[in-house]
Amino acid sequence: MLKIRLKRCGRKKQTSFKIVVMNNLDKRDGQAIEELGFMNPRTKEKYLNINKINHYLRLGAKPTKTVFDLLNKAKII
């Protein structure tokens, strides 16, 4: 099953996150199928590729709770 979830990146104590599509059994920092955007919680910077996100949602990918909340704020879902 595909999941749209956050993948941690960045330096220690200066984290940022990539929004990626992964198999639900893969590790958090495992290999992603595709990168859909990024989020930096420190600077509140976000980028979401809406076309790719909608494509994977139509294919049946389930967003995690955090990603679901991000998509709700961006009015994608």
From Swiss-Prot:
PROSITE patterns (alphabetical): RIBOSOMAL_S16
SUPFAM superfamilies: Ribosomal protein S16
GO BP, sorted A to Z: mitochondrial translation
Subcellular location: Plastid, Chloroplast
MF term (GO), any: structural constituent of ribosome
Top-rank lineage group of the source organism: Eukaryota
One of the record's GO cellular component terms: mitochondrion
Assigned keywords, A-Z: Chloroplast, Plastid, Ribonucleoprotein, Ribosomal protein
Family listed: Belongs to the bacterial ribosomal protein bS16 family.
Miscellaneous comment in the UniProt entry for this protein: Although originally identified as Cyanidium caldarium, these sequences derive from Galdieria sulphuraria.
Protein name: Small ribosomal subunit protein bS16c
